Amino acid sequence: MARLTLDGLRTILVACAGEDDGVDLSGDILDITFEELGYDSLALMESASRIERELGVALADGDINEELTPRVLLDLVNGAQAEAA
């Protein structure tokens, strides 16, 4: 099973919710909250659904919130994949 990378996460975010004009997703966004990146809870839930469909990783609703950072989300997804392997 392929690990989710930051580039892969960027692709999912843009596909699910678009890209805020004021945010450069190509920069170092690992430790910026999704709220600061312009993604609300609905966008994050759509992204989580896509992660589940594409990678087979179901994230708990309590894990997904606007204070989450891409680094933490990547750790959650990749950690769940490692446990399932």
Swiss-Prot record:
The keyword Phosphoprotein applies. Pathway: Antibiotic biosynthesis; granaticin biosynthesis. GO terms for biological process: antibiotic biosynthetic process. PROSITE patterns: CARRIER (PS50075), PHOSPHOPANTETHEINE (PS00012). The modification O-(pantetheine 4'-phosphoryl)serine is found at residue 41. It comes from the Bacteria. Residues 3-81 form the Carrier domain. 4'-phosphopantetheine is transferred from CoA to a specific serine of the apo-ACP-like protein. Keywords: Antibiotic biosynthesis, Phosphopantetheine, Phosphoprotein. SUPFAM superfamilies: ACP-like (SSF47336). Transmembrane segments: none annotated. It holds the Pfam family PP-binding. Acyl carrier protein. This is Granaticin polyketide synthase acyl carrier protein. It comes from Streptomyces violaceoruber.
